[in-house]
């Protein structure tokens, strides 16, 4: 499992540290934003075939891998491109959906239990939530059902609602998390112990783990994925 939650805990420590330079804190904040987004992508919390990077698929006729289409092809097809203007338009639509649209009734629950003094536990819950979609949406019929298959049709149509939901959750949680860090900066600086962390993010590269381990992790938290 790619330890996004470990990264978030460590970079939270660095953001509130009084012993780091302004540049180091700035870098830590950038990584914190990055990892909170990353943790909501189901395959960033998955060991199977290095988070799907080793599962070959096609998308709109182009060869790629399962991880990549969840990172890139699916959202870009939905937004119509990868320009900053496309991202801003999507963000505006998601903001409306959260404030007064389809997510308005559930958005408050997304930050329930958020505790920046315990970032590991907080974000582990988010990772577990995202990982559940591996079984229900990413590979609901197992790895063999998607290998070498073009996933830009029916698969995309089923996946896009989860992609959009997870991005909305990530945005709401990121805003709430950063607000909480800012409000509790002095308390956090006293309570959190600063660890030595490689700012390149190399400490958080994924480790290869066999499928049986991935199954055990999912079963331990109550997921029924058996493939």
Question: What is the predicted function of each stretch?
Answer:
Residues 1-35, 42-227:
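C-terminal accessory segments of proteins
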